[in-house]
Every structure is written in C-alpha cells, then in structure tokens.
Amino acid sequence: MPYDSVYSEKRPPGTLRTAWRKFYSDAPAMVGLYGCAGLALLCIFGGWIAPYGIDQQFLGYQLLPPSWSRYGEVSFFLGTDDLGRDVLSRLLSGAAPTVGGAFIVTLAATLCGLVLGVVAGATHGLRSAVLNHILDTLLSIPSLLLAIIVVAFAGPHLSHAMFAVWLALLPRMVRSVYSMVHDELEKEYVIAARLDGATTLNILWFAILPNITAGLVTEITRALSMAILDIAALGFLDLGAQLPSPEWGAMLGDALELIYVAPWTVMLPGAAITLSVLLVNLLGDGIRRAIIAGVE
C-alpha cells in the first residue's frame, strides 16, 4: 500500500475550544473579563491594599482635591472628603459591599431561580398556571420599588438590602428560566429524545440546559448589573449600607450636598458604579456570543 495514500484525519475543534477562540478574539469581551477579574480581586483584597483606613481622618486635609489638581497632594491620590478621609481607600474597600454583595445576591437568585424555573417549565396544568400568575404579579412591581418595600419593613442594613434585592431578582430569574425551558420542550429534538426512551431528567440535563446556556448567561449578567445598581441605590437612599460604610451608593448619597464644593466626592463613586456595570455587561455579551458560536 503506498504511503502517500494515507491521510491523517483532522478532528474538528470541540464546542469549548470554539467558544474560547470566539471569546478570545472578541476585544470588548476580553476587556470585560480583565475588568471583572480586577473587580473580584478588589472585593477580596481591596481592604488590604487600601493605603489608609476607611475611617481614618486627617485634620487639616478636608476636601482635598485629587493629586493631579493644583492643590492636590500625592499622599491622597483621589483626594479627601469633608471629614478628611482618603477617597481612594474608601473606594477600594467599598468594592466588597457593592460588587461582592451583588455577586452573592445574583448567585443565590440564579441557583434558586434555576431550580424553580426548570421545575415550573417541566410541569403543566394547574401548578404551572398558578406559578405563572404569581410571577406575572411580582414582575409588575419594579425591582427597586419591591426592594424598598422589603427594607422598609426589615429596617435599613446591608444584609436587609441584599435580601430585598434577592427577593426582587428571584421572580425575574424564575420567569426567564421557565420561558426558556418551556420553549425548548416544544421543539422536535426533545420529542425525538422522548420517543427514544430518554427520561425527563436526562432531557433536562443533556438537552435543555446546554441549549439555554446562552440565554441564561444573559439573564445572569443582567441580574448582576441590576443587583449592583439596586444595592447602590438603596445605600444612596439610606436604606441599605449605613455610614460610615464605604459602600459606593452610601458614599454617593453622603457626598451629594458637596457636588458643587467637591465634585470628585460624588463623581468618583458614581464612576465606579457605572464602570462596574459596564464591565459586567461587556463580559456577559462576550460569553453569550462565544457560547452561541460554540453551539452552532
């Protein structure tokens, strides 16, 4: 047999490799990945790398502008607030209650919503109809308004705000998973799997979940963005984290009256919140596009 007639078989790249190639070549997605990794590191080590304590006050250095300003000091890179506290230290320490708290809330809402949504999507009849009406009722209430109502009864505290945001995100997550599972169950490949003898659990695990991953990632990133904004909004309204907590929303609300005197005390926490939400959305969109490319 001649050797030149033997060819090596080329294996097509797998789903994960295709998805990673798509994700790696997407510049906004990589920006979101590195940015979210930086936020995660700040949530863990932000309090340790802060140059000063969150409540450490410096007499005679109140309302000091950032270091690049004419009257700024290098020792206080982002300036100080009205009590002489270092703004950079408070921003670094405030990543944990704002972004870290939002991540915990989103993770809990995702796990509970995934279980309830899959169970609701796989059932039919009266139970599905009752759950559908309950979810529609809860979804008619804005998430921030629902969180404010819960905090009004429980009292202002960061843990109460996190519970309120979780309670506001849960119906949206359940509804999204329910709709995706219900739509997938009506497709032909699920009917073919049932005729082939597959159980409901196998269909949900091996057929439904891989096909709703892209939509689920979109909902998770949307929920994380909403959680960051809602926790910051409750802190801004003095219903969440209480002063002297360095939570970004509480910092923003405390410095609001200084917007004309010391605008950096308002702009920097607001910029941190905006940048966090932007990075989360960039990462989520990149993951969704990569998953769709890998599945296709």
UniProtKB/Swiss-Prot annotation:
Molecular function as annotated in GO: putrescine transmembrane transporter activity
Residue spans crossing the bilayer: 29-49, 99-119, 134-154, 197-217, 223-243, 258-278
Compartments in which it is found: Cell inner membrane
Topological relation to the membrane, as annotated: Multi-pass membrane protein
Major location category of this protein: membrane
Spans within the Periplasmic topological domain: 50-98, 155-196, 244-257
Record's keyword terms, sorted: Cell inner membrane, Cell membrane, Membrane, Peptide transport, Protein transport, Transmembrane, Transmembrane helix, Transport
Induction: Part of the sapA-sapB-sapC-sapD-sapF operon, RNA detected in mid-log phase cells.
Highest taxon of source: Bacteria
SUPFAM superfamilies named among the record's database cross-references: MetI-like (SSF161098)
GO cellular component, one term: plasma membrane
Cytoplasmic side stretches: 1-28, 120-133, 218-222, 279-296
Pfam families named among the record's database cross-references: BPD_transp_1, OppC_N
CDD domains reported in the protein's UniProt record: TM_PBP2 (cd06261)
GO terms for biological process, alphabetical: peptide transport; protein transport
Domain ABC transmembrane type-1: 99-284
Disruption phenotype: Loss of resistance to protamine.
Reported function: Involved in a peptide intake transport system that plays a role in the resistance to antimicrobial peptides.
Family statement drawn from the similarity comment of this UniProt entry: Belongs to the binding-protein-dependent transport system permease family. OppBC subfamily.
Protein name, entry field: Peptide transport system permease protein SapC
Organism of provenance: Salmonella typhimurium (strain LT2 / SGSC1412 / ATCC 700720)
Lineage summary: Bacteria, Pseudomonadati, Pseudomonadota, Gammaproteobacteria, Enterobacterales
Gene name tied to this protein: sapC
